Amino acid sequence: MANTAAESITPAHVFHIDRTLYTGRPADLTGRPEKEKVTYDLLDKLGIAYQRLDHDPTATIEACHDIDALLETEICKNLFLRNAQKNSFYLLMIPGCKKFRTAVLSKQIGSARLSFAEPEFMEQYLNITPGSVSVLGLMNDKENRVRLLIDRDILEQEFLGCHPCINTSSLKIRTSDIVNIFLPYIGHSY
């Protein structure tokens, strides 16, 4: 009997999630990147409580749907944008299910021709890579080169989901802790 096309397709990788919802940082940080450790250090220093899931790398918001369900909150869609001159940078936080409309945002903030910023700018200003974009990366923007834009729907949620500057873990954090503790501490506003 011949194989059908569907039978011959094998997934290149099965996405794995450690289904345990942890409170706080990992007990063993061996093998974790420094930028992740520094993120936990700052959250702990500020007294910001968080829950954590560990998982395979997530490169897209679509890959986060199972994580959303386990965290019982929606992972934010974090878009790192720039203007045409490459001298103004923006981190936009919107609900994962919301469509991004460049023209609408451009008009709202008075910046024509927005586009996605290149990975080298993510690394330079936020010390993150594509797939790991997070509000927590703003702790690395010491010169406030990146303007934070938060969708009203995010601000109305009790919790938000984000990465600790690496896309192999996701955190559930009170939105009010990000807005009232984290952002003032790092000198950013929205």
List the predicted regions and their residue ranges.
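Extended, low-hydrophobicity, polar/charged segments
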Residues: A2-Y190
